[in-house]
């Protein structure tokens, strides 16, 4: 896994580095990106362009046919990309598209090997208990003064990159932990007891078997629950409610593992252009592999505390900003669809009404006063129990877009009918 060596150009405590730490991460909006580092780096000398020599920090892994990393090495290097393939092109190659295969004939065997390895790694991760959430989020684009929400189809080519990045992140984190080096880990603590118990009750009310211990839930408990519901209508909502029951992943100088990935040890190594923790650990790794372990300990032991805390804070702030801007663009998108009717799924139940999600992942609100009858909210069952009709999370309904509120960034629906299963 070859990653651009950004630290060669962004020196520790330099003005560029201080600004990167202050930003913490790149921020992505539908119409623009606020980069962590200048575009001259991200789009220029640190971009692994086709046919150009680039400096890298690489994690070299030798993996056997069972998906086990037999040995690994972290090295500095220079690479020259033969081709810059897109996900679509890789998908076409694997699907046997003759024109694409002919165009990239020199890397066809390599791409096929990557696909073969990914198919080995997937069941290995599943056996560990990785919680593979399938939460659909609207991908909003703003181009040529037009808002679009394309169908974000997940291809196998995406899984290849994801599998290799996760493996590299684990391998690098395990290397640093074994050396007891100062480091920034990516941690994800297990769900707290109260939220796990609430989620367990929700799953049981859906008719699912959920017998895990709320005070000591394991990744495979959640994974098995998802697997048991993958062919049911409530699968999408189960994913979303499961996500809400989990803690937020964050950065820490202390390793406590990663619950969602069922990883004993994890970090972010693969994106130093857009995440400060990656940049920080690249520096530490370079000190160590060049025989300067003592200098790394002296220089970075205190700094990793600051880097982890600031990066976690900035990540949360960036995510909030992205959500707010996305919500505004969704509201603008739905403002042009007043009066249109859609099939939706109830995604939230409150004392004040229902939230419903459309097939393209846009959510709207149905106020309780627009529903017929009187209602009692039963939160532990995610249920709005009425004198005429009751509504619970996961049920399918027919809705109409009534109005939008730009100030609150909210779309209001009218409930037309409950769809009987």
Per-range role (PLM):
Residues 382-387:
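Short alpha-helix capping/helix-loop boundary micro-motifs
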Residues 1-381, 394-421:
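Electropositive polyanion-binding surfaces
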């Amino acid at each position: 896994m070859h990653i651009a060596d950004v630290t060669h150009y962004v020196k520790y405590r330099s003005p560029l580095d201080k600004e990167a730490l202050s930003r913490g991460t790149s921020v992505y909006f539908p119409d623009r990106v606020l980069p962590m580092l200048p575009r001259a780096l991200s789009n220029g000398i640190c971009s692994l362009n086709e046919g150009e020599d680039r400096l890298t920090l690489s994690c070299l892994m030798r993996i056997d046919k069972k998906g086990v990393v037999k040995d690994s090495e972290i090295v500095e290097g220079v690479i020259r990309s033969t081709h810059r393939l897109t996900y679509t092109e890789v998908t076409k190659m694997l699907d046997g598209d003759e024109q694409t295969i002919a165009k990239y004939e020199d890397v066809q065997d390599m791409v096929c090997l990557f696909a073969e390895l990914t198919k080995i790694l997937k069941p290995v991760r599943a056996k560990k208990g990785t919680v593979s959430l399938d939460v659909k989020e609207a991908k909003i684009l703003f181009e040529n003064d037009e808002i679009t929400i394309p169908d974000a189809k997940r291809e196998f080519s995406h899984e290849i990159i994801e599998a290799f990045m996760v493996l590299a992140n684990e391998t690098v984190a395990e290397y640093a932990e074994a050396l007891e080096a100062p480091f920034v880990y990516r941690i994800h603590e297990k769900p707290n007891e109260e939220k796990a118990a609430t989620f367990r009750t929700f799953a049981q009310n859906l008719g699912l078997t959920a017998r895990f211990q709320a005070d000591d839930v394991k990744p495979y408990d959640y994974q098995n629950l998802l697997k048991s519901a993958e062919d049911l209508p409530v699968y999408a909502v189960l994913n979303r409610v499961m996500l809400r029951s989990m803690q937020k992943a964050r950065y820490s100088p202390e390793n406590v593992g990663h619950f969602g990935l069922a990883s004993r040890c994890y970090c972010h190594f693969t994106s130093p252009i857009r995440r400060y923790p990656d940049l920080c650990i690249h520096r530490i790794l370079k000190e160590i592999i060049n025989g300067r372990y003592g200098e790394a300990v002296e220089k970075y032991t205190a700094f990793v505390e600051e880097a982890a805390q600031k990066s976690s804070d900035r990540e949360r702030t960036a995510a909030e900003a992205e959500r707010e801007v996305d919500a505004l663009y969704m509201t603008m998108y739905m403002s042009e669809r007043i009066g249109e009717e859609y099939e939706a799924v109830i995604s939230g139940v409150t004392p004040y009404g229902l939230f419903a999600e459309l097939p393209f992942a846009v959510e709207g609100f149905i106020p309780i006063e627009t529903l017929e009858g009187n209602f009692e909210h039963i939160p532990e069952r995610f249920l709005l129990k009425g004198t005429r009709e009751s509504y619970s999370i996961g049920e399918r309904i027919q809705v109409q877009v009534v109005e939008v509120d730009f100030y609150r960034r909210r779309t209001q629906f009218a409930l037309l009918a409950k769809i009987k299963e």
